[in-house]
Amino acid sequence: MYVRHLALTDFRSWARVELELEPGRTVFVGSNGFGKTNLIEALWYSATLGSHRVASDAPLIRAGAERAVVSTIVVNDGRELAVDLDITSGRANKARLNRSPVRSAREILGVLRAVLFAPEDLALVRGDPGERRRYLDELATTRRPRIAAVRADYDKVVRQRTALLKTASGARYRGDRGALETLDVWNGHLASHGAQLISARVQLVNELAPEVEKAYQLLAPGSRPAAIRYRSGVDVVEAEAAAGNSDEEMFEAALLDALSRRRDAELERGVCLVGPHRDDLELRLGDQVAKGFASHGESWSMALALRLAAYELLRVEGSDPVLLLDDVFAELDSARRQALAQVAATAEQVLVTAAVEEDIPAEWDARRIGITMQDSDGGRISVVRT
């Protein structure tokens, strides 16, 4: 798989750019702040409908513009698919597949399968559980695009159930049974959608675990062994996940039971205390949790191992995913650079950003595309250096 064409309109610092890309290695070279990472971000957005840098879409739209457009042509086993994404702040994104509108932007998921390595990856180890949940859900969605709808439905249930909890707390003291009966209905929705999401995550963790262990050993052969496991606030869910069980019906029953037991606490606090939105992917080195105990080098090795494991899972399922490397070589020591370069050598397409040529492995035969900035009527914009 490779991206043959990338076009951006009013995306971040790019007013307009069209790039013809090729299989093999391409390096975008430019000073920090010149917009090279924005190219990688646009490709990642096309692959996942999310940014690796910001949580909302508003920053993706160039100042003064109403919307941003990301267009790609992806080649997979000789077949071309064109994807156009219209990004508008505060409204649902619109998408076209081979120039025909689709009902939901989620329908383009799976067209571009990519794995991203970025400086932000350290947050996978050192950050909040939300970073690791996002890693699991993005990878699960890349492999099985229907999971995006499961996640969207679950998030909607959590929002509506949280709003109900805030009002139902007072209703309980007034003896209003209607609000509590409505809460029971939403408990069923949360358990149903939550069980599907947990099942997808647990299946993924089961497949990821041996790949993470192997990748970490490659990156840090003298270090402690790496391991991952799914953590849940529901004891039954955690125990079954640890045993490799991903049965949806069992998870649904466990969630319903936990919701029943935590009802008073939820009404008291007005928040959802049960569900996969509170779960975590635990990363371990030897007998210690990586977060808080891993050194800087160990943290980088663990973060890279998670990405390399994702790449391997996607690769064995079909064609190689596109490798996106955003300024990571500058962050790594020589051993980790060499291990990452080894994997990149086998990929069908690798797209890399670097501030200076010296950040790229010397032995790489790669196409260089220079990125610079210039003044325009609308302010400073990124351009390809000619």
Curated annotation (Swiss-Prot):
Keyword DNA damage: yes
Stored InterPro entries: DNA-binding_RecF (IPR001238), DNA-binding_RecF_CS (IPR018078), P-loop_NTPase (IPR027417), RecF/RecN/SMC_N (IPR003395), RecF_2 (IPR042174)
Entries under CDD domains matching the protein: ABC_RecF
GO-annotated biological processes: DNA replication; DNA synthesis involved in DNA repair; double-strand break repair; SOS response
Any one of the GO CC terms: cytoplasm
Keyword Cytoplasm: yes
Similarity section: Belongs to the RecF family.
Function: The RecF protein is involved in DNA metabolism; it is required for DNA replication and normal SOS inducibility. RecF binds preferentially to single-stranded, linear DNA. It also seems to bind ATP.
Name used for this protein in its record: DNA replication and repair protein RecF
Source organism: Mycolicibacterium vanbaalenii (strain DSM 7251 / JCM 13017 / BCRC 16820 / KCTC 9966 / NRRL B-24157 / PYR-1)
Organism ancestry: Bacteria, Bacillati, Actinomycetota, Actinomycetes, Mycobacteriales
